[in-house]
Amino acid sequence: MDILTYRQSPSEQERSKSLASLISAQGDTCLDIGARDGFFAMQMTDRFSTVTALDLEKPKILHPNIECVKGDVTDLQFADNSFDFVLCVEVLEHIKESLLENACNEIARVTRNAVVIGVPYRQDIRLARTTCVTCGGINPPWGHVNSFDEKRLISLFKDLHVERIEYVGTCKDVTNWLSTKLYDYSGNPFGTYAQEESCIHCGYSLLPPTSRSIFQRIASIIANTLNHLQQSIMRPRPIWIHILFTKVSELEKI
């Protein structure tokens, strides 16, 4: 799915509306981590004098009040308290477990006042996995190597204060250990091969399997049936969680 189609989807518009309601702050400086096409960075130019748009590859956003920067959330090249506000959405789920705490510490370090974090909520990252045809490695959907709930996010930003939590969308997207094994055996034919993210093991692009045996096809049918049965009795859960954090001053910590 191209980025324009993604932005225009009803679920994405609902998510964007929630995030906009949390970005109520105004000030001089703002940092958008994982800026991509600049969708949120452009919106924040109405509230901040300067918006820094950061991504792993330098964003190409043409706006007089947006400064595009190539950078890594695990090693932000900014001084402490550099920004009045920091936005970080669709980022933390991609960060390796070993670097996740450091990334969150960096976000908290560079903000002066507030942070908004947006991630998938309790995502079952066993569902819709992919199998790399190059190396045979199994990948999580959309390159999401982490799953989050309120407790985990709050613990990762333990030095910040929770101001507000919002939940967006509903789904029943879950699987089970048996379906997972069957899908893996069948080559994960229904995985997220349309994703931009490459294989987390070898770095090559992910391509769907070109051929499967009759046994693999049967395995995927059984896995699908088990998933549908499971999802029919599951309670819906939110798709996204958004949290507005504020920075606690040193005096308030005492």
Where are these regions (language model features)?
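A SAM-dependent methyltransferase catalytic signature shared across enzymes that methylate proteins
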Residues: 150-169
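Conserved catalytic loop of SAM-dependent methyltransferase domains
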Residues: 164-210
